[in-house]
Amino acid sequence: GLTLVTSPLWAPAQIPLSGFNGVLLLSVGVALYAMHMTLYGASAGQESWYLFASVSGFDAIWRIVAICAVGLVSAHLVGLEAATVSPVLLWLLMVLLLPEARRVFGSRADVSSGRLLYNYTLSMGSSTANAVLMMGLPLLLNASIDSNDSLQQVILAVLILAISITRSPIMIPLQAFQGVAVSAFLKQQNHPLRAFAKPAGALLGVGLVGAAAAYALGPWLFGLLYPPKPSEVEAYAQVVTSPVLALLVFASAFLALLVLSGSLVIALNMHRSYVAGWVLAAVVACVVAVSPLPLLTRTLLALYTGPVLGLLVHLGAMVW
């Protein structure tokens, strides 16, 4: 309801081409996403870690498949927006089709209503920080550049596309992998850093391999999939380079580590530390993103500094 009521304040600037359809889809998506997160949180509370991983993993897979399907059929803006929002129906299908999901979804809280409200508040804080770090940076970066500078606008558009592409190879498999990681972690929770080291090493290894591949093949592959228009050639020369693409891929490994460490901290019932890590990561990334540094420099710094500091908070919580 709040999204719908406040839409006149932000919709014209943020989704000028979508109009009422975009606002309606976003409002419905926000409402249904609350149920999605209820299943996600309850699965953690019930220690149903494979369901926990499935809720997040299939969310990402569904979104990619839906967007590709719409793109092949029509690529109409409303269709693409609906495809982006459609994973909020995943919780409903899981509850209807999976007995374990029904059991978890119907479980009752094991704390008082006051404590439950407090936990909800923490969850809202961490979800907000997560959303800012995952998807809010483009808005901040866009607000921080001169709207009359067409080159900066094009550079930002190419940079956002590059960030989206370089994140996917690590973040999507992580969604399916983290349930296994949490389950293995809990078996060794008396030695949390040792338990965290193996999956963390795997993620960093994937990040290094991906960065090397991006350095060697990234510019060629990017240009093949997204050939530049004449107005984009100069922007491509700055963004679509081997060092930049390699750094973007490796940055996604640190974001993945933050996501994984957050899941492990939640598994240990350290909710405040979980929120603190995500909030610190989001705040630092936002501050760096709007700093007076050159656009490309501050974007790369924001992608590294925020997740690394948030990760350190989570690791500190595991130890102390």
Give residue spans per PLM region.
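Interhelical loop/hinge segments that connect adjacent transmembrane helices in multipass membrane
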Residues: 50-55, 77-78, 83-84, 93-134, ...
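Hydrophobic alpha-helical transmembrane segments
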Residues: 20-27, 53-102, 280-284, 296-320
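Membrane-water interface segments that mark the loop-to-transmembrane alpha-helix transition
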Residues: 1-8, 21, 184-211
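Short membrane-interface helical motifs at transmembrane helix boundaries
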Residues: 2-20, 209-235
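Membrane-interface junctions at transmembrane-helix termini in multi-pass inner-membrane proteins
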Residues: 32-54, 186, 250-277
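Interfacial/gating helices of multi-pass transporter permease domains
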Residues: 77, 114-123, 141-167, 239-242
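Residue-level signature of transmembrane alpha-helical cores of multipass secondary-active transporters
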Residues: 25-26, 30, 52, 56, ...
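Helix-loop junctions and terminal segments of transmembrane helices
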Residues: 1, 162, 166-190, 267
